[in-house]
Swiss-Prot record:
It comes from the Bacteria. Its main location: cytoplasm. Pfam families: EF_TS. GO terms for cellular component: cytoplasm. This is Elongation factor Ts.
Length: 219
């Protein structure tokens, strides 16, 4: 087991706002891994960010992002607790990052709870059919299908998508970091994504790649 140093405890405490003993216990449970320890605290509701998420967030901003050339447009509503925070550079920057994420990664829903039950059922059905085609044993079909649905969530639910600027983080992590830094509950409420000519027959182009280039993520 990794040795838990005072420096590690202090670092986790500064990042989460949790108590010293809670930080030490979380680090021990996580085997000295800071990221996992932070997750342990969040699950137990002991981090400052976790506590803030229960507070009402009725202020915020509705922001837009138009991709270069006008081929993709995004509207997103992000809520916070006060008008003061809504006007800060940090919050405005976060909202812009989220809008660009939506433009680049094409999510369909904010969180998995919003995915219609019939859509989930259809994905499970397709996953099982594919597994049978691959001659997988019936006993493990459910497990395989569940794994496929989890992947579906990570592709199409905004909060579970990998961040386009750092694929080691999910959007949920980006939001949690922002809550801890800004000091208020922050929630992504809803969004709309528009693609020029969507549904019409046209030449196929990689729009996600173009957005990434516009954001300076590709050369």
């Amino acid at each position: 087991m990794a040795e838990i140093s005072a420096k590690m405890v202090q670092e986790l405490r500064e990042k989460t706002g949790a108590g010293m003993m809670d930080c030490k216990k979380a680090l021990t449970e996580a085997g000295g891994d800071l990221a996992k320890a932070e997750e342990v605290l969040r699950k137990k509701g002991l981090s400052a960010a976790a506590k803030k998420t229960g507070r009402a967030a009725t202020e915020g901003a509705v922001a837009s992002y138009i991709h270069m050339g006008g081929k993709i447009g995004v509207l997103v509503e992000v809520n916070c607790e006060t008008d003061f925070v809504a006007r800060t550079e940090g919050f405005q920057g976060l909202v812009k990052e989220i809008a660009m994420q939506i433009a680049a990664a094409s999510p369909r829903w904010v969180r998995r709870e919003e995915v219609p039950a019939d859509v989930v059922a259809k994905e499970l059905e397709i996953a099982k059919a594919q597994a049978r085609e691959q001659k997988k044993p019936e006993a493990i079909l459910e497990k395989i299908a569940t794994g496929k649905v989890e992947k579906f969530y990570s592709e199409f639910c905004l909060m579970e998508q990998a961040w386009v600027k750092d694929d080691k983080k999910k959007i949920q992590d980006v939001l949690t970091d922002a809550v801890a830094k800004i000091g208020e509950n922050i929630q992504i409420r809803r969004f709309a994504r528009f693609v020029l000519g969507e549904g019409l027959e046209k030449k196929q182009e990689n729009l996600a790649e173009e957005v990434a280039k516009a954001a300076g993520l590709q050369k």
